[in-house]
A protein has these predicted regions:
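Mg2+-dependent phosphoryl-transfer enzymes with acidic/Ser/Thr/Gly-rich catalytic loops
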Residues: 17, 185-186, 193-283
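Active-site phosphate-binding/coordination module
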Residues: 39-136
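Short, surface-exposed amphipathic charged segments that create phosphate/polyanion-binding patches used
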Residues: 95-104, 191-192, 267-272
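Asp-based phosphoryl-transfer active-site loop
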Residues: 18-35, 223
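Conserved acidic, metal-coordinating active-site core of Asp-based
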Residues: 125-213, 217-226
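Short loop/turn segments at strand-loop or loop-helix junctions that form parts
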Residues: 22-27, 87-89, 144
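Structural motif
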Residues: 21, 83, 209-211
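N-terminal amphipathic/basic-hydrophobic helices that include classical n-h-c signal peptides
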Residues: 1-14
Length: 283
């Protein structure tokens, strides 16, 4: 069930953990669709123990809300995220067995996108024509963006991405959000990173107490010391993500997906002097 609250009340977090917020991308990072299980049991148990000790877990994804909730239900996890960031910008908090939209943030986000997209709408036919004349790609509009792309392959997506970036450079606040062959226009002020920091602001948690894990281009805004001190990339992350994480003294695992995330969380807990066995072990 999804409801909207004017101002969701967020309880404070325990003060005895070096990680107060764990923000994970979903597909390819926390969740591996073709793995069995899609989320390693060890990662689920680790997150569960951290939550019991007072940490908050955020799934930070490009999926829309219905798609994410459906996949979570089918995965039969033993843990539940405290917060959801969907389509890289909308925030929901778990309260009383339901996810409640943060109305003030989500309303401002929707208004900012509406105003921005109104400014670029007259240019869209030209942009779509440029893509369609050169590539076998799907270009379309949905409820989240007037320009969405599914390229045939990553090489085509790279070229189209460069073209769109050149256009965005001439339009204040416009950016391209990309994951693999998928891309769409978005407002630069609303990203995985700014949404994570908004959650942290409401919880009175600074970036030094936040861990973020991701694998692809749309994760780069949150894989930044501006938003999180502890940065993690699994072995399946693309090279640009691994480079960004390494340059900020983050952890690049030699294991993929959820196993890699677990290694990263364990590494930073140990670096901060917290042994995993010292967490609540009843779960």
């Amino acid at each position: 069930m999804i409801v909207v609250a004017a101002q969701a009340q967020m309880p404070g977090v325990s003060m005895n953990l070096p990680l107060k917020i764990i923000s994970t991308d979903f597909d390819g990072t926390f969740f591996a669709e073709f793995a069995n299980p899609p989320v390693p049991d060890e990662l689920q148990r680790l997150i569960q123990r951290l939550q019991t000790a007072g940490a908050r877990w955020v799934i930070n994804t490009g999926r829309d809300l219905s798609s994410l909730l459906e996949t979570l239900a089918r995965a039969h996890l033993c843990v539940r995220p405290d917060y959801l960031v969907v389509v890289e910008r909308e925030i929901y908090v778990h309260e009383r067995n339901r996810y409640v939209g943060l109305e003030d943030w989500n309303r401002a986000c929707a208004q900012a996108h509406e105003e921005l997209f109104a400014r670029v709408r007259t240019d869209l036919p030209r942009l779509m024509a440029w893509v369609n004349e050169r590539f076998d790609a799907a270009v379309y509009e949905d409820s989240y963006s007037p320009f969405c792309l599914i390229a045939e392959n990553n090489s085509d997506a790279d070229i189209i991405h460069d073209y769109l970036n050149d256009y965005c450079a001439r339009v204040p606040s416009l950016t391209v959000v990309r994951n693999d062959v998928y891309a769409r226009f978005s407002h630069a002020a609303y990203s995985k990173g700014t949404a994570l920091s908004e959650i942290a602001r409401r919880l009175s948690v600074g970036p030094d107490l936040i861990l973020a894990a991701g694998d692809h281009l749309n994760d780069l805004p949150m894989l930044s010391r501006e938003h999180a001190r502890w940065l993690v990339a699994p072995s399946n992350a693309i090279a640009l993500v691994k480079d960004a994480v390494r340059k900020q003294d983050g952890f690049v695992s030699d294991e993929p997906h959820g196993h890699g995330v677990a290694r990263g969380v364990q590494f930073f807990l140990e670096s901060a002097g917290v042994a995993e066995t010292s967490l609540n072990s009843k779960t």
